[in-house]
Design a protein with these regions (language model features):
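Transmembrane-helix exit segments and adjacent C-terminal regions of multi-pass membrane proteins
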Residues: 40, 51, 112-195
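A surface-exposed, glycine/aromatic-enriched loop/edge motif typical of exported proteins
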Residues: 99-118
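C-terminal module of multi-pass small-molecule transporters
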Residues: 1-103, 146-178
Length: 195
């Protein structure tokens, strides 16, 4: 269980690091150290997860335990993507709309079109805006809004990782009596000889 906790801690540091490092002018190489730490954490936590989950499951029920673990992992991944995607794109839209509202001379319809283009392209439209000198100031605002949205999404992910780390502290302590759980007689036949 220690390896899983260590992995989650590395993931937490890596994701929070993204929130700290990312900015409108951040070079790609500046994210490499925190992404490395995050990747190390994923490797440590994910590789051990099935074994940790199945450690307390009787051999006869290992298929159910493995299936439950796999389903929980898939539901968690899908929920995380949905939540963080919503945070990212709603923050991007809100921040960019607010910034564009401060520029006189841009009609509301055009502001909406810019925000929609940036959101629907997941930021790819920013490069097109930056290429035209007339829209370069808008591109700078869009970069800033995208950075703010990315930071908030990263800190939200770090929050959920912190919850996971705290929850993991309640696991792996053995039974309430402090004794190692015993394999019932019906499970001993399928568990194989004792070592």
């Amino acid at each position: 269980m220690f390896t899983v906790r260590l992995g989650i801690a590395f993931e937490l540091v890596g994701v929070a690091g993204i929130g700290v490092v990312v900015g409108p002018g951040t070079a790609w190489w500046a994210t490499v150290p925190v992404l490395f730490v995050y990747g190390l954490g994923v490797g440590l936590a994910t590789a051990q997860l099935t074994g940790v989950v199945l450690a307390e499951v009787p051999v006869a029920n290992s298929g159910q335990g493995s299936g439950t673990q796999s389903t929980s992992r898939q539901v968690g991944s899908a929920s995380g993507i949905a939540i963080l995607g919503t945070v990212l794109f709603s923050t991007l839209g809100t921040q960019l709309s607010r910034k564009l509202a401060g520029i006189p001379g841009i009609p509301a319809g055009q502001r909406t079109a810019i925000v929609t283009a940036v959101k629907q392209s997941a930021g790819a439209a920013i490069a097109h805006l930056a290429a035209d000198p007339r829209t370069a100031p808008v591109a700078a605002m869009a970069k800033d809004a995208f950075s703010e949205a990315t930071r908030l999404a990263a800190f939200c992910a770090a929050f959920f990782l912190a919850l996971g780390l705290l929850a993991s502290l309640s696991l792996g302590r053995g039974s309430a009596s402090g004794q190692t759980p015993r394999i019932p007689a019906t499970d001993r036949k399928t568990a194989g000889p004792a070592a």
